[in-house]
Structure formats: structure tokens, C-alpha cells
């Protein structure tokens, strides 16, 4: 078939005649590479060879980077301050506002009649948790506290005082709990973990610097005494001026009073159990040593 006339036909004919592009015929574009100017050597210096007149710059090497002629350099005069000290070890908590939580409940992504933890929040696409990037869970912030109207039993990792008051004013309960990176990964991605057929690990206790936070009833810590938590709920209600609802008379009292064991990761699943996804069965250990290990 003959090539069509015009510039298109000429280009097609040119491509047909040119050799294929290979490593043997690749070349830089003209003018892309500039040959470095070769300075003079010995008596063939070619006048000053770009080094100027007599002195240190012509005869010797250039001073090192940062040299200021003998005086104390800038990087030694200004003292160091650890603004970013330990930045790679700091724990991060992804923010979740009360406004966002109410939005997820209104859309039906989160069921308020069931206990809420990171599994429900991640599945509802409310937050994104990346344990490999030093994420340690969710912090509940008070944005939208005046508009929040749901009654929930929620577990987060960090919460402000006003956010706690907004939850409890509606008759809900909130708990702050710590998860180590492995437990956090299992909690955020339960289905891939169950498909591997491994026993549910036990949750590790918080490090030393977080023990005070999670044992404090004012923070609703999961290691705090329940009697102190009840007293802290009453004090917070007096502080913000609302009447604390009596959840013992609520029809959802059983759901609202559900709490995890300090070693437990999932609601209703104990450490050491194996979830068989293909057969939809739960395998529980019977050996005394395993029971002693997972309960300790």
C-alpha cells in the first residue's frame, strides 16, 4: 500500500527507512553535554587558569565548607535545641471529630446499637490507621460537640475532656485503651488475620510513660477502677452543667456496659481463640498451659 502524500506520508516513509532504536545507536541530543574546561597544568597554565591573582585561592586548595577564616563558625556559635528530638519514636493518633462520628452514624456506616472500636471506625472509612507509620490509634476531638446526639459505647486511644462530656451527656460511655502495634494491626485488619488461621494474640500492656494516663479515671482509662470512673463521670457532669443519665435503666444497658478485658483485642473474642473463616467456626484452646499464658 502506497504511503499517502504530504508531511504524514514523508514521516511514515522516514520511519520505515530508519534503523530500530537500540543501545548501540542511542546518543545524547546535540548540545546536551558540555565538555568541562580543562585548567592549565604546570607551565602550560594559560595565564591565570581561572584562579585569579596571587594568594591562597591561586596556590592552594579552597577552604573547607563552613570555614569562616578562623573565627568560631556559625554552626558552633548557635546552640542546639532538641525541637525534633525523638521524632521518629513519637506516637501518632489520627483525629476523629464528633462531627465526623455523627456523620458516619447518620449514613448507617456505624451501628450505634453495637460497641464501637477501631474495627468499626476503619471499616466505615472514618479513619485510616497505619501502624508502620507510628500510628497508635484514634484521638477523639471535640469538634461538633454541640451537634453530637448519638448514644454510643465507644473505645478510642485518646480523648479530650469536652469530647468525653459530649458522649456521656447523651447517655453513652467512652473508654480509652492502649494497643501495641501488632494488636493494632490485627484490630484494623481482622479478616486477613483470620484467614491466616493464627490464634488471636493477647494485647500488651501500655509502656511506662502511658500507665498514668490509662489508669486515670478522668481519662476513662481502661485500667482505671470502675468505682473511680463512676465518680469522675459525676464530677464531669457537674463541671459542664448537665444531668448524667442513668444508664442502668436504659434498654441498651447490656451493650453500654460492655467492656474489653485489658488483654482482649476484639469484642466477644478472647486471646488464644482461632477463627476458622471457611468453616465459620471458633476454635478454643483447652491446654492448661495455653489458658494460663493467654489469661496472664
From Swiss-Prot:
Please tell me one Gene Ontology term that the record gives under cellular component. mitochondrial large ribosomal subunit
The compartments listed are: Mitochondrion
Known Gene3D superfamilies for this protein? 3.100.10.10
Here the segments flagged for biased composition (Basic residues) are 32-52
Identify one Pfam family in the record.
Ribosomal_L27A
Transit peptide boundaries: 1-20
Q: Which SUPFAM superfamilies does this one have?
A: Ribosomal proteins L15p and L18e (SSF52080)
Task: Mention one GO biological process in which this protein takes part, according to its record.
Answer: translation
Q: Which family does it belong to?
A: Belongs to the universal ribosomal protein uL15 family.
Q: Which HAMAP family does the entry mention?
A: Ribosomal_uL15 (MF_01341)
Q: How does it assemble?
A: Component of the mitochondrial ribosome large subunit (39S) which comprises a 16S rRNA and about 50 distinct proteins.
Identify this protein by name.
Large ribosomal subunit protein uL15m
